[in-house]
């Protein structure tokens, strides 16, 4: 079984993933936040690097989902970020805010649409909703360098 936790940055996805994995003995799958070669550049010049960064995240999340699809047949896996948030929240927001050209956005969406033919949706998706002040407090308290530069 594949259980996905969705929510904004700082909403508690990783914390809930840890709690569920520990309580039920499920296998946790965390978003790899340690390395993205575009992240630092992105926060310095968002319009220039948004497409590159979003494609990098899409590639990583797609690889994770392929692995999850194979593993979730034998065990329950709980995941703390989904490919769908990257597409329908972050990338779409970058486009709407003028940080991504229409051409780049359509190229990105065509790539994602091609991937969806072999993806399986999670068996259950849990959405965490939080107020902005709570999100900001959580982001600041964990002190990830790249998040401190967020506009």
Can you name each region flagged by the protein language model?
Residues 5:
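Hydrophobic anchor at the beta1->P-loop junction of P-loop NTPases
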Residues 88-151:
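A glycine- and Lys/Arg-enriched "phosphate-lid" helix/loop adjacent to the NTP-binding pocket
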Residues 8:
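P-loop (Walker A) phosphate-binding loop of NTP-binding proteins
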Residues 60-103:
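A basic- and aromatic-enriched beta-loop-alpha substructure that forms the phosphate/nucleotide-
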Residues 22-60:
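Conserved substrate/cofactor phosphate-moiety recognition/catalytic segment
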Residues 13:
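Conserved lysine of the Walker
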Residues 1-2:
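Pre-Walker A (Motif I) flank of P-loop NTPase domains
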Residues 16-17:
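Post-Walker A alpha-helix
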């Amino acid at each position: 079984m594949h259980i996905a936790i969705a929510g904004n940055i700082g909403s508690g996805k990783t914390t809930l993933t840890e709690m569920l994995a520990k309580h039920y003995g499920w296998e946790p799958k965390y978003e790899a936040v340690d390395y993205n070669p575009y992240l630092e550049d992105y926060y310095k010049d968002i319009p220039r690097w948004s497409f590159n960064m979003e494609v990098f995240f899409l590639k990583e999340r797609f690889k994770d989902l392929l692995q999850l699809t194979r593993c979730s047949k034998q065990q329950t896996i709980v995941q703390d970020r989904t490919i769908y948030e990257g597409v329908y929240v972050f990338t779409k927001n970058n486009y709407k805010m003028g940080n991504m050209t229409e051409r780049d956005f359509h190229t990105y969406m065509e790539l994602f649409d091609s991937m969806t033919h072999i993806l399986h949706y999670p068996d259950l998706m849990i959405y965490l909703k939080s107020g902005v002040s709570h999100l900001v407090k959580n982001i600041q308290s964990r002190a990830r360098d790249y998040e401190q530069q967020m506009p």
